[in-house]
Structure formats: structure tokens, C-alpha cells
A protein has these predicted regions:
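Phosphate/dinucleotide-binding and metal-coordinating scaffold of catalytic cores
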Residues: 1-232
């Protein structure tokens, strides 16, 4: 029986490997804006983003991008979306950082990011919840008909900063499953404490409340660019 990408990435073995496995550095992703290191961890392929390799961002002065990467994964899991690869925080050769399961043989995105698929819809809603300011085409991972999202370092800002290429769902009504998922997110402090500031957690709760009140996907902003640049 075939196992989905989500099921593969959520196995106990993968979690144990990323958490406790020996780290072998393979190489660096040279196109990344912050240090992103491809490695083997307990035999599992992963991307290691050390905090020491993060460039300072004037509009994200608090916390670390690695913490936000982990927080995005935890929110995806809490919602039941399972649309972010397994991501943990641990010590590495260059200090603490995020370790995210590498999705082998990801496919070319092409024009598929324009589709109104259920998988992209989950990611669009996740982005609205975590206030993703950098959902680019290249941050979508396609494999075997499934779609995952990566690169969530610039998320959870307390000010509204949503920028994404997934605006095809704008102003659509939330379905009952999405509303139920949002209602389960009433106490995010339980799994986000230590990763985000209290102000950021408070803003997250406000965004969730607003989505439930409006019952719709948000519209693109009119007072700043709605799409990140470059879009890929």
C-alpha cells in the first residue's frame, strides 16, 4: 500500500532521527538568503537552518527565524493540515537551529500554484493564520500529487503582513472543516510558548478570531504589495 508524503514525514522514526540522530553536513544551499545546510541526520535527509546564520531583519526584531519555522510546523499539525514537513529545534554543528525533513525528488511547480486544489487551499489558510509574508512559488513542494509548504521564517508578525502567490481563494467562504480546525486553535500558547512572543501569540489569536467572524479567506491588501518579490 502506498504511503502519502504526509504520512512518511510524520513517522516516529523520522522524529527520533531528527531529534537524536548524528548530524553529517553534506553541503549548503547557495541560493538561500539565510544559511541553509543540507545534511543527513540519523540517516534522514534534512535542511538545517542555524540561528547563527540568520541575517538581521529590521521588521522582525524579536526571536529567531528558526523558531518561526518550528512554530509554523506546530500550527499546521494542530490544525490537522499536515502541510509542512516535520520541523524540530535542536543543537547542531553551528549552534541551535531548525531541522526540517527534506522532501526528496520534489517536482517542478510550473503553473500548478494557480490551481484551486484542496492542498493549496490548506496552505492559503495556513498562511493567513500564521501571517506569512513570503509565500513564493518556490516555497511550494509538489510530490505524488501532494503539496507541502516550506520556508516559514518570516511569519507570525504581530502586524498584518500577508504576502502570497495563493490569492485564488480570496473572499471564498470557509468550509465546515476549516471552521472546525480554527476552533481547535483557541489555546496556541500550549505549543508555541518559547517560540513566539506573547504579542505574536496574541496577534495569532486575533487573526483566528477574525477569520471565524468573517467566515472567509482574506482579500489581498491594498496598502502594500500582496505578492512577495520575486514571486519565485
Amino acid at each position: 500500500m502506498d504511503i502519502s508524503v504526509q504520512e512518511q514525514m510524520a513517522t516516529v522514526d523520522n522524529f527520533d532521527a531528527l531529534t537524536n540522530g548524528e548530524i553529517e553536513i553534506v553541503g549548503r544551499l547557495v541560493d538561500a538568503s539565510n544559511a541553509s545546510i543540507y545534511c543527513k541526520v540519523g540517516g534522514v535527509s534534512a535542511i538545517y537552518k542555524p540561528i547563527a546564520g540568520e541575517r538581521p531583519l529590521w521588521d522582525f526584531p524579536d526571536g529567531h527565524l528558526a523558531w518561526r519555522e518550528v512554530a509554523a510546523y506546530k500550527v499546521s499539525q494542530a490544525l490537522g493540515f499536515n502541510c509542512v514537513p516535520l520541523t524540530i529545534l535542536r543543537d547542531g554543528p553551528f549552534g541551535d537551529g531548525s531541522f526540517q525533513l527534506w522532501i526528496e525528488d520534489a517536482e517542478e511547480v510550473g503553473e500548478r500554484y494557480l490551481e484551486k486544489s484542496p492542498e493549496l487551499r490548506k496552505l492559503a489558510l495556513l498562511d493567513a493564520i500564521i501571517n506569512n509574508t513570503d509565500r513564493k512559488i518556490g516555497h511550494l513542494l509538489y510530490k505524488n500529487g501532494e503539496v507541502l509548504g516550506c520556508d516559514h521564517g518570516v511569519t507570525f508578525h504581530q502586524d498584518y503582513k500577508l504576502r502570497t502567490v495563493l490569492w485564488q481563494f480570496a473572499d471564498l467562504q470557509l468550509n465546515p472543516e476549516e471552521i472546525s480546525a480554527l476552533q481547535k486553535m483557541q489555546d496556541p500558547e500550549e505549543f508555541l510558548e518559547g517560540l513566539l512572543t506573547q504579542s505574536e501569540i496574541g496577534a495569532l489569536k486575533v487573526r483566528i478570531a477574525n477569520l471565524l467572524q468573517e467566515g472567509k479567506f482574506p482579500l489581498p491588501p491594498t496598502d502594500w504589495p500582496a505578492i512577495p518579490w520575486p514571486p519565485f
